[in-house]
Structure formats: structure tokens, C-alpha cells
UniProtKB/Swiss-Prot annotation:
Keywords: Cell cycle, Cell division, Cell shape, Cell wall biogenesis/degradation, Cytoplasm, Peptidoglycan synthesis, Pyruvate, Transferase. Belongs to the EPSP synthase family. MurA subfamily. The active site is at C119. This is UDP-N-acetylglucosamine 1-carboxyvinyltransferase. Its EC number is 2.5.1.7. GO terms for biological process: cell division; cell wall organization; peptidoglycan biosynthetic process; regulation of cell shape; UDP-N-acetylgalactosamine biosynthetic process. UDP-N-acetyl-alpha-D-glucosamine binds at R95, R124, P125, V126, D127, Q128, D308, V330. Pfam families: EPSP_synthase (PF00275). Pathway: Cell wall biogenesis; peptidoglycan biosynthesis. It comes from Deinococcus radiodurans (strain ATCC 13939 / DSM 20539 / JCM 16871 / CCUG 27074 / LMG 4051 / NBRC 15346 / NCIMB 9279 / VKM B-1422 / R1).
Amino acid sequence: MQLTPLHVTGGRQLGGEIAVQHSKNAALPIIVATLLSSEPITLHGIPRLSDVYTILELMHHLGTRHAWVGPNSLTLHTPEIENTDAPYALVSKMRASFIVLGAILARAGTATVSMPGGCAWGPRPVDQHVKALRALGAEVIEDGGNFFAHREGSLNGSFVFELLTVGGTHNAILAAALGEGTVTLENASIDTDVVDVIEFLNALGARIEGAGTNTITIHGVKELHGGEYTVIPDRIEAGTFMMLAAATRSRLTLTNVRPDHLRAVTSKLAEMGVDIQEDGNRMVVDARGRDLKPVNVTTQSYPGFPTDLQPQMSALLATVPGTSVIQDPVYPDRLTHVAELHRMGATITVSGYTQVIQGGTLHAAPVKAADLRAGAALFIAGLTCEGETVIDGVQYLNRGYERLAERLRGIGGEVMQPEPMLAADD
């Protein structure tokens, strides 16, 4: 069934309270990490997103049985690995699925995983994943778009990542968590999602040290037991709603947030003139009546400004008079939103990974999202301007934002997604 576009009518202030979902980017590797245990595990805070259903389809192929036991609670059980391959038809849908390589290798000793897919912008190679596994004693062969991995005994040794990689760090941790070896990872990612995966594994009996630092040490254990765990809040969704409040010059209260995960975003919005108040896991973002200032932004790995919020920041800065500059060296090709914002009247000049934005007033237009975060930029832009903006490519938004239209309506947004017309033989 073809998804119908989002119809967004903006030009009004938003207000009220919106609960931030739990982190998709932590939930996906944590779901994969349940492969390391033969006992049932219940996860809380699992967003019902298309990416989650995709990874569950792959997990089912590998031998996992799952059941939703609450609106966002999921029990998974993998008594044994039934298949050690992750075929292209499943892996090609989503890049994050590649970390099953390390998990299957740890549990079964051998794994075959196809090259990953996901959002269609730019190259995001997996060479650091493969180099890490090889350095730790696994044999990994690439042939015809597939990776064949095998280990004899436990992984051991150390590896220095050549660049910061969240997925590569996940894969190496999962591969080394079981067994009798000791593995040290240097220049490892300190991303919040990596920390959450480590804390989840340790809750099941793993022995992993150094979470939140660039040096992670994994002492292999014989087995992991079952248990329960709650995934952290989604800092990217929180940042998206913070920018929505700023772009629409509104006051929004965000709940279920981790302000300590949002320092780079908070400081940049404060520099623009947005008032932000924190109270535990609540955050009030107030841009009412404020003349926001242009800023310069450069993306970095955590704890820097996240590349996953770069398109949303472009949409916000397109509404701020003056000249702003955004540089995204993390993913230089993440620019699919720019042409669509042009259709809405934005003035953005691109050179390499640099955007020079002359802020002004946007207008409604038909646009199309080509990836998840571009879609977020477009619904932010649509809610800033009068008239109806029709956003196609809703399938990408469904990868990262749960019940988006319903939740935006809850804070005063006029956002509709008509039911699709069914053919007579459907």
C-alpha cells in the first residue's frame, strides 16, 4: 500500500507538552544484542518504527521470537541461532542491521552478512567494522557483496579505530562480549547509544569497562542471562522538537529528555537567543517574540553537534534573518533537503559540505523527503509558513518518528495524513 503524503499547514504558534520517544539508534543495537543471550529479555521504550519492524524481521530469520507486551515493551527470546546468514533482502533495507555480524559471530562462531543499506545519501563504509574484527582474531572475507566471518576460539587483543564510528564500536563490542578473551578498543565511540548498549549488556552479566570513554575493555564471559532494560530517550528527536519550537517561535515543553545528552544543541540554540529551561527530564524551549540571531554550526561526533540534526538546523536557520553557515564534515553528502527547502523559498548556497544560508521567510510548496532527517527538516519548514505544504516520502519519516502527525497535532500543529485510496481489488 502506497503511503499518502503529509499535509502540513503552518504559520501559527505551537504550544503544550510533547513526550520524546526512546532512542531508535540505541534500541536497534540493543535488540540485536539480545542475540547474545539464550534467555528471554524484555525491553522497554522500544519505538514502533519501520526500522524496528525491519530489524525484528531479520531477528526472526536468525531464530529470535518476539512479542509486544505493552505499547512500547518487547520481549525477545533466542534459544539458539537457527540461521547464521543475514541475507541481502533483509540487510539492504537498513544500515544498522550490519551489526548482526558481530552478534552472530559471538554466539555461533560463524556469520554471513550482506553489505548494508539504509538512507540513500553518500557512502558510509564498513571497513572499520571489518578491520576491528580481523585485528581481534576473526577471519573476515568479502566476496560478491557478502562478508563471511569465522572465529576459532575467543576474540583477543586490541584495535585502534582510525576514525570514530558508532556502528564499528557496536560490532566489535558484540563480537567480543562472549568467550574467554580480553579485548581493548581505542578511539572507540563515546556516543550515548554506545553507552546504552554497554549498560544493557552489563545488566545481563557482561564485563565491559570504559563506557563513555574512548577506551573500552571487554572481558568475555561464558554466557549472558535474561532480564529487563529501558532504552534511553532519543536525543535526535528531542533536538528536532527543540528546533521546531525555535523555527515556529513557539514555547514547547519536552518530557522524557536527557538534557546532558543535548548540550551541543542547547548551547547553539541559546546562542541564537532561544530560552531553554531544564528541570530533571523536562525541558522548556521558548522562542516566542524573539529576534533570533544567525549562527555558525559544524557537526561533530558526540558530544558535538550531531549530523542527524543538520538538516533540521538548516530549516530553522532558513527562517532567521542574516547569514548562517553550516558545515557537515561527518556526512558531507547529507544535502538532499537543500533543494526541497529551495522550493519553499530558502536561500542556501552549497559548496562541498558547507551551506551558507540567508535567512528569511519560507512559503508552502509541494516537497519530497529523500531520507529521514530531510523529512524532519521539511515538516519543520512546513509548520513555519502559511498555506499547505505537502510532503511526500513519508516512509522515511516513519523510520524515525513514531505517530508523528498525531503528536504534532497534540501541540497545535495542523498536520494530516489522508487514508490511502484502495483499488477495487485490494
